[in-house]
Regions:
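Conserved N-terminal phosphate-binding loop of PLP-dependent enzymes in the Aspartate aminotransferase
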Residues: 2-404
Length: 404
């Protein structure tokens, strides 16, 4: 017998892969819609969506068809040549941003890479300082990590690229004071509309507009990381649109490819002219297959009218979970289908495990926050079943008091 025949997939994972992910708890072999199937044939409702990636769920016909057609026609050419799909996607994203100035796109493979491009654009202004939010997350490559306001993620890899300073998320007074220390040397401010990895945290109302005004006053680039919030996730195509803000640079990934690896860095107006030939690049970024998938995702979101559906469904989920009045639930925060169930105790990992036992995939994004980021095609019926089962999940995650 071969090793494949005699050894479990988990054991093979432990032997063959680096330990940076630990050992995942499930062996998944297939998926359709909002449901995934494990190696033991058990099905799970995926309420995490590959961490906000699978905008249309698993094996969506539009994505499967677009990718199949494209890979059979032209799979990869590098950025030494032009192909129609990458131009079409850049033009489509520009039309969706719907701003008065021209928009230029740089395509890559992930959110971290999109934020690396934004970092370089900021430095091309000739200024060195980049201001980022405490508790923010922008990726694990070195430039993106330098802008990530979570010391535990940075410390193992120090020294970081220099010039990044941090302010409390949502505190415009603190940010203003930081800018005022050296406004002429401040290249950019980078923020997330909602801190997804940081616990699904929203800033105070008007914060993004205040950041925009501050940046405009001092000639500072406003970079908005919409890797997690973009492409309909919060009930708007871009979360910045809800705030009425036009950034200088916006970064995208996750839901854009519907499961295919693609990121985008979009630069508005003069910011789009800062990178010149030879200053940045990527071998696989913007390849025809990933671009075809992204166009299929955008088409489907529009034709199926998913954005108002996401906005409405998110409000239903939040209200119904809070109406359970369960002692382990404090409140629900977030927008659309990027929600954080805030617990009254640091039991998010236990809730994640109990949900898995009950047939649901959710994520612990903080010790006391359970993240929901399901496919945008989630139905009210699926929500109703989850909410009905949630009290049992929460009870199972709650430590039982000793009777001795």
């Amino acid at each position: 017998m071969t090793r494949t025949d005699t050894t479990s997939l988990t054991s093979r994972w432990d032997s063959a892969l680096m330990r940076n992910y630990g050992t995942p708890p499930l062996e998944l072999v297939s998926g359709r819609g909002v449901t995934v199937t494990a190696a033991d044939s058990r099905e799970y409702v995926d309420l995490l969506g590959g961490i906000a990636v699978n905008a249309l769920g698993h094996a969506h016909p539009a994505v499967v068809d677009a990718v199949s057609r494209q890979v059979a026609e032209l799979g990869h050419v590098s950025n030494l040549y032009i192909h129609p799909t990458v131009v079409a996607l850049a033009e489509r994203l520009e039309s969706l941003l719907a701003v008065d100035e021209p928009v230029r796109a740089f395509f890559c493979n992930s959110g971290a890479e999109a934020n690396e491009a934004a970092f370089k654009i900021a430095r091309r202004t000739g200024r060195s300082r980049i201001l980022a939010a405490e508790n923010g997350f922008h990726g694990r490559t070195m430039g993106a990590l330098a802008m990530t306001g979570q010391p535990a993620k940075r410390e193992p890899f120090e020294p970081m690229p220099a010039g990044v300073e941090f302010f409390p998320y949502g505190d415009i007074a603190a940010l203003t004071a930081l800018v005022d220390l050296a406004p002429g040397d401040t290249a950019a401010v980078i923020v997330e509309p909602v801190q997804g990895e940081g616990g699904v945290v929203e800033p105070p109302e008007g914060f993004l507009a205040d950041v925009r005004s501050l940046c405009s006053e001092h000639g500072i680039l406003m970079i908005v990381d919409e890797v997690q919030t973009g492409i309909g996730r919060t009930g708007a195509m871009f979360a910045t649109r809800r705030a009425g803000v036009v950034p200088d640079v916006i970064t995208l990934a996750k839901g854009l490819g519907g499961g295919l690896p693609i990121g985008a860095c979009l630069a508005v107006g003069a910011a789009g002219e800062l990178l010149t030939a030879g200053q940045h690049g990527t071998t696989f970024g913007g390849n025809p297959i990933a671009c075809a998938a992204a166009l299929a995702v955008l088409d489907t979101i529009e034709t199926d009218d998913l954005i108002p559906h996401v906005d409405r469904l998110g409000k239903i989920i939040a209200a119904e979970i809070e109406c359970l009045d369960h002692p382990l639930v404090d409140h629900v925060r977030g927008r659309g289908l990027l929600l954080g169930v805030v617990l009254t105790a640091p039991l998010a990992k236990a809730v994640e495990g109990a949900a898995r036992e009950a047939g649901y995939l959710v994520g612990a994004t903080a010790a006391d926050v359970v993240r929901l980021a399901p496919p945008l095609i989630l139905t009210e019926e699926q929500v109703a079943r989850f909410v009905a089962g949630l009290p049992g999940i929460l009870d199972a995650a709650t430590p039982k008091e000793s009777t001795s």
